[in-house]
Each structure stands twice: as structure tokens, then as C-alpha cells.
Regions:
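Carbohydrate-associated surface elements
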Residues: 161, 178
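Nucleotide-sugar-dependent
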Residues: 17-18, 204-208, 263-265, 275-297, ...
Length: 368
């Protein structure tokens, strides 16, 4: 009889966020490894849906799973003041109610979550909990302090620096994100001279730094050799950047693809030569701990990678394949691009190691 994995999260689906994509990608490969997966999440947005076909189309997967969208009659999304406080209160109440209502005492239950309060309440009921930790926060520090030494709790940290911030943990492992290799095609036509960025243009409401990057792209005349292709972003963000592009007179060299589905995104990435990692230093997670899905997609697609010089990017696996730049330094972007041309492609073993199939196998070996 197949084991059932309860993937319980305060995220909602479908959503354009990288974290929702990461969750669905993990679920897909848990299923491919032979587990039954039941996804529980709140129907907290007007666009939220627990229709399997809707999620399959949005995220480009065919695997079947059980989905339980749970009604969300809580302040977050309904009260438009003190939004951060409303989020934390709602997250706490929803998690406590979900664990209490949908799971009766059964030691066979296994949970996978990136939700602090789901991990907390499930662990306190002695269920096996696999808790994926992506960043620090005061609530997370409290939760891990309370349950980190439980023998039934297994914690996955996205990088070593994050793991080292937490002591006295019984079971933990460092696992970066991985790539869904099913989305890639072989033997595509020759790559075009383009730098590509795939993802949201802001994080937590703060720009990732594209206006500054575009100015550097223009100042160092990168457009003479490489176009810039941007996949993703809300319409208002794209319009703002188009204004910057127009003011810099580089409209002929910057292509805005807008939002694309997973297959279309990967196809565009595969057609380019260089992948871009860009973020804002004001966010601790972006600066110290991020493990972006796009990075693994870039290198699996055999792109060179250039990245703003943050500790999080230097902590990525195979970081010797990355060329770093500093937007405050003269010709830094040009130097990084030239260095990136000399990087060797990944070996077959390296490609296997960054796959989601390998990542999920490591999770199963660690916690099952």
C-alpha cells in the first residue's frame, strides 16, 4: 500500500509566486517516486482553486493528486489594515483549525510543509513532520526552538548558512532547490544572443533592482552584443520598466514576454545564452538565503549565469559556474559577462544532481 504524504501549506493555488511553483514541483516528484499526495491549502484569494485540472494546466503537470481547498473566513485578505498582523493571526488560526479538524490521532500520518504553524501543531500531536525552512523570522525562530529537537521533526534548510543559524536540532539536512527536467526539450535550434531573466520583478513588494540593472546595461553598452529578455512581472511593473527602457533609448534591445506558462518559460530560457539572477539587498532572505528555481533552470538549459554578488548566490551549488557583478562598480557587468563565456557546461552527473528527482530521493532517504 502506498504511503500518503499530507502536503499542508498556507500558500494558495494557482499563484504566480516562485514558492507556489516550488511546492507543486516537489509534489509532482513525490508522486513520481510512488507516494500518494494530498494537498491542503486555504481558498483565500478570489482566484484560488482546488480543481486539479486548473492546477495541472497552470503549472504544466499531468500527475494526479488529492486536493482539499479549505474555506478561509479569516482576516487576511478581508481586512485591509495591519495586513502583516492579519496575515500572522490568520496563518496561526487556520493552521490550528486545519490540524485539529482534518487529522485525528494517527501515528501513520506524514506531513510536508513550509508553514511554521502547520509544523508546530502537527509536531505537537506527534505526527511525523518534514519542515522545509526557506528563511529566518521571529516566528520561525520560536517554532524551531520549540519543536527542533523533536525526534518526529525533520528540517530541510535551503542552504548551509541558514542551517547554522539554528542549534540543538535533532534531524536536519541542507538541500537546495532543483529543476523539473521533464519541461526541457533536446536538440533545440541555435541559441540567440540574449540575457534572460525569468521570474517576478519584485519580492515582498520591493523591486528586485531592474531600473538600476537597465541603466548599467545601457551604460556599459551590453546591448551591442546581447539583448535582454524578461519573462514575468505584473502588467503595471512591466509598464514602469518600459518607461525606463524608453528613457534610456534601448527599446530595440529589451523584450518583455510577460507571464508565460511553465513550458513556454523553459522554451524561452533554452533559446538564450545567459541567465540573470537579480535581487534587492534590503531583504535578508534575498541577500543571505535564497535558492532560486530559475538558477537551476538556467544551468540545466546550458546557459552561462551572471548574478548580483550576494552571499546567497555564492552559496548556491556549482557556484563556480556563476560570474558575479556589482552594480556600483564600473564595468563590473561587462567583466561578468565576459567571464561567463569561459564556463564549461555541466557534466551528466552534475545535471542529475540538480534535478528534482534527485532532491526528492534525498528527502525520502532522510526522513522515511
Amino acid at each position: 500500500m502506498k504511503q500518503t504524504l499530507n502536503y499542508v501549506t498556507y500558500q494558495t493555488f494557482p499563484a504566480s509566486t516562485a514558492n507556489s511553483l516550488q511546492s507543486i514541483s516537489n509534489i509532482k516528484y513525490f508522486i513520481k517516486k510512488g507516494l500518494n499526495v494530498c494537498l491542503y491549502f486555504p481558498l483565500r484569494e478570489k482566484t484560488s482553486s482546488d480543481d486539479l485540472k486548473v492546477l495541472q494546466e497552470y503549472y504544466s503537470f499531468t500527475e494526479s493528486l488529492e486536493i482539499k481547498g479549505i474555506n478561509h473566513y479569516l482576516p487576511h485578505g478581508r481586512i485591509q489594515i495591519f495586513k502583516k498582523t492579519m496575515f500572522h493571526i490568520s496563518h496561526f488560526l487556520w493552521s490550528r483549525r486545519t490540524i485539529s479538524k482534518y487529522f485525528k490521532k494517527n501515528n501513520e500520518e506524514i506531513f510536508f510543509t513550509r508553514s511554521d504553524w502547520i509544523a508546530f501543531f502537527a509536531a505537537r500531536k506527534k505526527y511525523k513532520v518534514i519542515f522545509e525552512c526557506h528563511q529566518e523570522s521571529r516566528i520561525r525562530n520560536f517554532v524551531i526552538k520549540k519543536i527542533g529537537d523533536y525526534e518526529n521533526v525533520y528540517i530541510i534548510f535551503l542552504n548551509k548558512d541558514l542551517q547554522e543559524n539554528y542549534k540543538n536540532i535533532s534531524n536536519s539536512i541542507v538541500l537546495h532547490n532543483g529543476v523539473d527536467v521533464d519541461l526541457f526539450e533536446e536538440n533545440l535550434q541555435q541559441k540567440r544572443n540574449s540575457i534572460v531573466y525569468a521570474g517576478n520583478l519584485s519580492r515582498f513588494g520591493v523591486s528586485r533592482g531592474f531600473p538600476e540593472f537597465l541603466k548599467k546595461y545601457n551604460e556599459e553598452k551590453i546591448f551591442q552584443e546581447f539583448n535582454l529578455e524578461i519573462i514575468g512581472g505584473d502588467l503595471d511593473q512591466i509598464e514602469d520598466l518600459k518607461t525606463v527602457v524608453k528613457d534610456l533609448n534601448i527599446e530595440d534591445y529589451v523584450i518583455f514576454h510577460g507571464r508565460k506558462n511553465r513550458s513556454e518559460t523553459i522554451n524561452i530560457i533554452q533559446m538564450c545564452k545567459i541567465g540573470l539572477l537579480l535581487n534587492n539587498a534590503n531583504n535578508t532572505h534575498s541577500y543571505q538565503h535564497t535558492s532560486p528555481l530559475k538558477y537551476f533552470e538556467y544551468i540545466y538549459a546550458k546557459l552561462s549565469v551572471i548574478a548580483i554578488d550576494f552571499p546567497s548566490h555564492r552559496s548556491l551549488p556549482l557556484n563556480q559556474k556563476i560570474s558575479y557583478f556589482d552594480l556600483d562598480k564600473n564595468r563590473s557587468l561587462n567583466v561578468a559577462i565576459n567571464q561567463s563565456k569561459n564556463h564549461d557546461e555541466l557534466s551528466a552527473a552534475e545535471l542529475r544532481d540538480i534535478s528534482l528527482e534527485t532532491r526528492i530521493k534525498k528527502i525520502l532517504d532522510f526522513a522515511f
